Amino acid sequence: HCFGVVLATMNCLTHGCTEVMVERFNPLVVLASIHKERCTALYGVPTMFIAELNHPMFDMFDMSSLRTGIMAGSLCPVELMKQVEEKMYMKVTSVYGLTEAAPGMTATRIDDPFDVRCNTVGHDFEHTEVKVIDPETGEECPVGVQGEMCNRGYNTMKGYYKKPEATAEVIDENGFLHSGDLGVKDEDGNYRITGRIKDMIIRGGENIYPREIEEFLYQLEGVKDVQVAGIPSKKYGEAVGAFIILHEGVDMHESDVRDFCIGKISRYKIPKYIFFIKEFPMTGSGKIQKFKLKDLGLQLCKEQGIEIV
């Protein structure tokens, strides 16, 4: 929640702006607040904008006071950004970063061309450094070549509290924070995020670590092995997919898995897609090829007639 606290709340405090807050996200309350308070900027993750645009009472509210805003926290679909600009009358900007590089590493500007604001995450901030490196060699990548996004500057954390080893894993000897995200720098100095090195799932702006869910599902009687990976989602960007290998002779249904999860783990961590398979894609040395699970999930959805939402 660093994005909201720093770029919204602190920004309002330092600029003498009024901040209109809602107790918890509700698209109807947000729309009504914009209409009543004549808000000039709106922040949120893509799923929030989707909920607002698709609310049945959307046309009842006047959005003409909006000038700009930030869409961040997850990959922002170009079509969604177009709809926001057309229907909410605001110039959307985006910010890329992570809590360890608060409040971000790069950002687009309100005066950037629409194509830049929709298809890139903009330039690095003043007095900071961003570079794209080859994850294998550590060498900086040329323009147009994909690599890992790294950051150094006042926005880079000093380290994880009382965790020097964990800190050393992400901040190198030169002070660069390694994000684990893949990106590309274009000829104009704008960056585009292309994927993630890490296995983390980003569902509607919430970061989900597969291992946590895997360890939990291992406790379900009858589960022999389990892997969790992100499955593309039109609404959330990614959804949680669980790939389960059962012990021989065990009969289990998707509802059994979800019932086991309810009340024990956060609702957004409960797998949306559950697949019972015989084996995982493996390397010759016996390592699970986790990156192949996403494609496997899409294939299984197609074969089983499951709609991707």
What is the role of each PLM region?
Residues 1-22, 44:
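Conserved AMP-binding loop of ANL adenylate-forming enzymes
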Residues 14-17, 31, 36-44, 53-116, ...:
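Gly/Ser/Thr-rich phosphate-binding loop
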Residues 22, 28-31, 50, 58-60, ...:
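Short hydrophobic/charged patches on amphipathic alpha-helices used for structural packing
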Residues 34, 42-45, 153, 158-159, ...:
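AMP-binding/adenylate-forming catalytic core of the ANL superfamily
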Residues 73, 97, 122, 153, ...:
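Active-site glycine-centered loops adjacent to acidic/histidine catalytic or metal-binding residues
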Residues 75, 115-162, 170:
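Adenylate-forming AMP-binding core of the ANL superfamily, especially NRPS adenylation
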Residues 93-100, 121-124, 229-232, 275:
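Beta-strand->loop->alpha-helix junctions that form or flank phosphate-binding loops
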Residues 295-309:
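Acidic/polar alpha-helix N-cap and adjacent early helical turns
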